[in-house]
Amino acid sequence: NLKNRITKGPWHVDAIVDVDSRNRVVYFKANAREKGDTTPYYEHLYRVNLNGSGLKLITPGDYFHLVSMDKSMRYIVDNYSRVNTIPATALYDNQGNRLMTLEESDFSQLFMAGYKFPEPFSVKAADGVTDLYGVMYKPFDFDSTKVYPVINYVYPGPQQEGTFFRYIPMNPRTDRLAQAGFVVVCMGHRGGHPSRSKWYHNYGYGNLRDYPMADHKVAIEQLCTRYKFMDINRVGIHGHSGGGFMSTAAMLLYPDFFKVAVSCAGNHDNNIYNRWWGEKHHGVKEITDDMGNISFDIRIPTNQELARNLKGHLLLIHGDIDNNVHPANTIVVVDELIKAGKRFDMLIVPGNRHHFDDYNEYYYWRMVDYFSEYLRGERETGADIKDLKLGNWFQGYQ
């Protein structure tokens, strides 16, 4: 039987960290409660009595807090950062008292080498009301008097949005790509991260292909109006897995806006992707005809249905033994592109599954070459990739 509700309010409980059954206290992670946070995605540690009283913030500060609690539940190690701050670690007790700073990362050599932090931003969604939060990555030799092509790195979710709000080591799909002469942007969208709200998370239900697209297009339009160094006429898009699906869909839904895409390991047809994914995130539509007969529609719109819309430059990449997204997801798109008489490019990565292991560096340079050719007008000639050193940089980047 339900005894009582422990927490309430317009914020999100992410996970229970531990329960002190003797003192009847629960420690948990939550976000979007602290009014001083610059983004609702920042997680904090809290404690509250099981009867709902005594709610207390343990890890304050306008940061994303990664916490670890000792077995006695007396002490907490807090690793905190934003995308534009030096990561640091502090020790707290379970009452929220900061006992000491344990460590602060030394970025002196990075700064001497020219490193610059990415920049967080916020824009409005296509509804003109919902706030969206994102991160902008610039070349380290950025010149505000120049105009740069724009690349949108995407992941649709709906379990996350491919946007990091804490500091992470350089991501080849964002920071590193920007060093090739691009402004790279990532942002959330309605239907994305579950930590925003139930309404926000469910926005894409029943519309699994199209739901994030309008928000990204409108977000980029706002940024290009706000920042004159961003060229709205040279916009590319790329992503992996769900992001591969999304980047191709963007090219086909907004073919006059997105000019170039590198789409990697995309689940372009969610009717043949993992069955639970479509049923959970797209759902089953109940249809009643004029006679009162009920039928159920489980079909999900696909990218290959839109192949005839392609206008720009599309590079499709897939591992030939992908154990998450079957290569058939890309092949069906290829088939329809051929039938529609479209030019496109394709790279099959032999002997590789969903992530490309030692071929990740090759994938990175092919992506750089593709965007450089079609967004910057710079084409590498010859067969050799001069800077290539095969290796696996994938360490949890989505």
Describe the residue ranges of each PLM region.
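Serine-hydrolase catalytic core recognition
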Residues: 66-398
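Repetitive beta-architecture junctions, highlighting loop-to-beta-strand starts
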Residues: 41-45, 53, 87
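Multi-bladed beta-propeller domains
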Residues: 1-22, 31-34, 48-65, 94-126
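Short, solvent-exposed loop/turn segments at conserved positions within beta-propeller repeat blades
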Residues: 36-42, 82-85
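Residue position within the beta-strands of beta-propeller blades
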Residues: 26-30, 76-79
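A conditional alpha-helix N-cap/helix-loop micro-motif detector
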Residues: 9, 38, 296-300
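Short, conserved, GDST-rich strand-edge loop motifs in beta-rich repeat architectures
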Residues: 28-40, 160
